[in-house]
C-alpha cells in the first residue's frame, strides 16, 4: 500500500511539473475576433506555444485543410494558411493537444497598413468637414479597423497590443479619418471587406519610424537636431518602428499608405533618402516589396526660413521617382485654411489614395488618377517650356490667371511669371522682367495654393526647375 501511495505521489508531482511548464497556444493581438485576413493568398499566422509541440490551424473557409507548424525551442511557431476569395464571417482555430484558440467573425478581404504622424492619426473627433453626416453614415460592418496604441520602445517588440473593431459610428469618430475614407472607397469599388491597421503618432519624425541601425549608419540624418527642436515627442531613432511597426510586418497585408513629413521640415535635405531607406527596411523585414503610397504635406503657414516644407514636398516626389512600387497624392486643393496644419477635409485625401491604389495596384480603374508632375523644362527664346505627366487630356487653370508661378534669370531672382497653355498641354512661362530665363518654380514655398489642374481634377504638384 505504501509503495502504491509513493508511486501515485511521484506521478502526481511529475504531472504538476509538466502542467506548470506547459505553454498554452497564444497569438499576437492582430489575430483576434473581427479581424480581416488578406484574401487569395497564403496568409502568415504565428504565435507562441509549448516547445517541440505541433500546432494545427484550421480556417472555416477551408475546413478540410489543416495547416501544421512545429513550435521551436524558443516557444515560437509560424505558418502560412491559404485564403480564398473575399467573404465571411469565418472562424480560425489554432490548437495543439491541450489548448485551443478560436477566433470568430473573421473576414477575408483587402488589408492595408496606414501610418505616419498627426494627419494620419487625425480623427473626426478632432475635426472633420461635414462631421455629423460622415459619422452617422459610418455603419460599415465589412470595414474593420485595427488600432495600434501609441507606444515607443528601445528594443524590437513581438506584439503591439492592438485591437480590431467593427466600423460603427462610435468607432469611426475616434479612429483615423483618412484610413476610414480610404477603406470605404476601396470597399465600395472592389466590393470586398477591407481592414486597415492604423499605426500613427502626431508630431513624430520619420527617424522614429525607421529601424535604429538605418538612422545610425548615416550621419547625414542628423537626428540630434530634431531632438533639440522637439524634445517632448518620442524622437529617438527606431523607437516607434520597434513597437508600432515591427510587430505588424510579418502580417500579410496588401500595401501601405503614409502621411508624414511635417516634423522633418527643419532637416529636409536628407528626407528623401531617409524615406527611401525606411521603405526598403520595412520591405526587407516583411520579405516582400509591398506598395507604398505617400500623401504630400499640405500648404500651411509654417513661417519657415529655409523653405523646409517645400523641400519636404520635393523629397516626397523624389522618393516616388527612385523607389519602386510607390506613389504620391497631392492635396493642396483640399486645404480650406492655411493657418491650420491639420486640414479637416479628409474625405478627398482618402479617396485619392484609394483611387491611386485602385489604378496602380488593383488595375481596376482606367485613365488618369494622379496629379501632374513636372517632366521636362526647356528654354526657347525668352520662354521656358514646361512638360508634365498625366496631362494627356488637358491642363487647365480654374481662374483667370495662374497663381504661384515664378521665373528667374541667371541672377536667381524670382519674379511673378506669365503663363500660357499651348496646344500640347505644355506651359509657356515668361516675364518681361526676365530677358534670359533659366528657372521657374510653382507653389514652391510654405503655403501657396495653386490653381493648375489636369482635366481629371488633380492639382499640379509644386516644383522648381533649377537649384541655385
Question: Which stretches of residues belong to each language-model region?
Answer:
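Cell-envelope and extracellular/periplasmic
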Residues: 20-468
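Bacterial Sec-dependent N-terminal signal peptides
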Residues: 1-22
